């Protein structure tokens, strides 16, 4: 099928990637980088002809209407005082990810970047990060979504929406 683009998403891209991995990427129509923002500039310089996009980005964690330390960027914070909640200020994230604001700013500021797919639109049952793999954890939800399991938007939902709608369309 020569009519459709072929792509892959991978989290191993860096300026030092070698071998079969690079050969495979070179034959793709578009190269997806999972959480590759830190390596993007070096990969772009090494491969200026690649169409590159963020195939999995952000991994911010949040609980709707729960707020912690707005001046701090918190990552993988699972201390007991959190009561199994993540901050809806947009300042909680996993160690390998970025906040929604950081991911969106990165995308906006790089003309050669073809866009991004955030992880994830909706919360889901499983991967209760940052509490997964801990015994006796009552948490089931993933925290990653910009919409929770009840279908209600979290604050970052409005950040993303504001980038696509004008004030006249959605005042």
Walk through the language-model features, giving the residues of each.
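Extended substrate-binding grooves/exosites of carbohydrate-active enzymes
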Residues: 1-171
């Amino acid at each position: 099928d020569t009519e459709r683009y072929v792509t892959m998403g991978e989290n191993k891209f860096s300026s030092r990637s070698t071998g079969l991995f690079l050969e495979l990427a070179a034959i793709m129509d578009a190269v997806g980088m999972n959480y590759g923002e830190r390596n993007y500039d070096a990969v772009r310089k090494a491969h200026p002809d690649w169409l590159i996009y963020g195939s999995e980005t952000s991994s911010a964690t949040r609980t709707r209407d729960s707020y912690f330390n707005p001046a701090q960027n918190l990552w993988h914070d699972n201390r007991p005082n959190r009561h199994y909640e993540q901050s809806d200020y947009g300042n909680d994230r996993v160690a390998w990810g970025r906040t929604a604001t950081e991911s969106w700013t990165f995308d906006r500021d790089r003309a050669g970047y073809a866009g991004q797919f955030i992880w994830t639109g909706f919360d889901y049952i499983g991967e209760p990060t940052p509490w997964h793999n801990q015994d006796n954890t009552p948490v089931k939800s993933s925290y990653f979504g910009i919409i929770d399991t009840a279908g209600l938007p979290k604050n970052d939902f409005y950040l993303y929406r504001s980038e696509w709608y004008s004030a006249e369309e959605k005042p």
